[in-house]
Amino acid sequence: MTTKQNIKRYSRKELEELMQSIGEPRFRAAQLHRWLYSDRASDFHEMTTISKSLRETLDRKYFLPQCSMSSTQCVEDSSADSTTRKFLVQLHDQEAVETVLIPAEGRNTVCVSTQVGCPLHCSFCATGYMGFTRNLNAAEIAEQVFLVQDYLDAIGCGAVTNIVYMGMGEPLLALEEVIESVGILSDTTYRLHISQKKITLSTVGLLPEIGMLARSGLTTNLAISLHSADQETRASLMPSARDYPLKELRKTLIQYTSETGQPVTLVYMLLKEINDTQEDALKLVRLARSFLCKINLIDYNPIVNIKFDSAGEQRKNIFIRTLVDAGLNVTVRKSHGSSINAACGQLAINKKLPESSTL
């Protein structure tokens, strides 16, 4: 007996090729894609705009996997100033990822995961200590947003307005699937469509993939997990920086901003006595003056058995003042969901964290 294939593994282009290979007109692919990602059919026989014979062929050869989550897999932040919610999203192969809803300032932002685990092992990030299992496909990325929208509909709290690819994993290691998922989520003819201007992709700074992203035609925002403008310090925090040093990252970001005309966001987590001195701030000033950018400062979010501390208010204020006095565009991002391990760097599923880790 032939094993059924996952129809959601096919990109939009691959669906066109599939339809042509079985003698169907090319437009059938568009109909099928709409049923999958706008109407969100759970069975081929629901696809009434497609001929019965094609529905039967698809049902015989393919299956329609569904991601899922339940109310019991939702954790709410109980702090007075946050309504962040963290969801456990079950994938069809029994793997799972965490997805976060951040309602704030009139927006509903969804933070999506792109990998089960992460292979990059950033020292301040819980996900890296999970190890790495696999990339998500485009459907699994998009369905995280669909499921959160279902949740918002159920509680009467509006629509998803923004998406950040800042959950579990390194998005640019799954670049093809990420690009395909952005296409699904931003299709203006679909039921749920988010402007690409309200979608942000994050990366530790994978240089070849940043170049590919610049040429992809997407108009999404790009955030760089920087965390230090000193090469030695950055490499000690983020092993990937050894392969992609700051000197080369700077050149790539100059080219990226020149090609796209869009600023990048430099994300900088302030860590006590590691990257929070005035000298560190001045190094960041010199780097940031090289290309069009804005700087997003964030506090360290505690992780069990990882011995970092947040910079104190005095050191943080001196750091901020140094950047502002240099004329840089600086925002201080409020962490949402730290009390439920849903903030930046805290996402991890049922994996043992290290007994002790420090720089």
From Swiss-Prot:
GO cellular component: cytoplasm
Cofactor note: Binds 1 [4Fe-4S] cluster. The cluster is coordinated with 3 cysteines and an exchangeable S-adenosyl-L-methionine.
Location within or outside the cell: Cytoplasm
Catalytic site positions: 98 (proton acceptor), 344 (s-methylcysteine intermediate)
Cofactor(s) needed: [4Fe-4S] cluster
Alphabetical list of PROSITE patterns matching this protein: RADICAL_SAM
Annotated EC: 2.1.1.192
Domain Radical SAM core: start-end pairs: 104-339
Predominant location category: cytoplasm
CDD domains: Radical_SAM
Entry's Gene Ontology BP terms: rRNA base methylation; tRNA methylation
Keywords, ordered alphabetically: 4Fe-4S, Cytoplasm, Disulfide bond, Iron, Iron-sulfur, Metal-binding, Methyltransferase, rRNA processing, S-adenosyl-L-methionine, Transferase, tRNA processing
Binding, S-adenosyl-L-methionine: 169-170, 202, 225-227, 301
Reactions that this protein is recorded to catalyse: adenosine(2503) in 23S rRNA + 2 reduced [2Fe-2S]-[ferredoxin] + 2 S-adenosyl-L-methionine = 2-methyladenosine(2503) in 23S rRNA + 5'-deoxyadenosine + L-methionine + 2 oxidized [2Fe-2S]-[ferredoxin] + S-adenosyl-L-homocysteine; adenosine(37) in tRNA + 2 reduced [2Fe-2S]-[ferredoxin] + 2 S-adenosyl-L-methionine = 2-methyladenosine(37) in tRNA + 5'-deoxyadenosine + L-methionine + 2 oxidized [2Fe-2S]-[ferredoxin] + S-adenosyl-L-homocysteine
Family statement: Belongs to the radical SAM superfamily. RlmN family.
Other information: Reaction proceeds by a ping-pong mechanism involving intermediate methylation of a conserved cysteine residue.
PANTHER family recorded: 23S RRNA METHYLTRANSFERASE (PTHR30544), RADICAL SAM CORE DOMAIN-CONTAINING PROTEIN (PTHR30544:SF5)
UniProt-recorded name of the protein: Probable dual-specificity RNA methyltransferase RlmN
Species the sequence originates in: Prosthecochloris aestuarii (strain DSM 271 / SK 413)
Lineage: Bacteria, Pseudomonadati, Chlorobiota, Chlorobiia, Chlorobiales
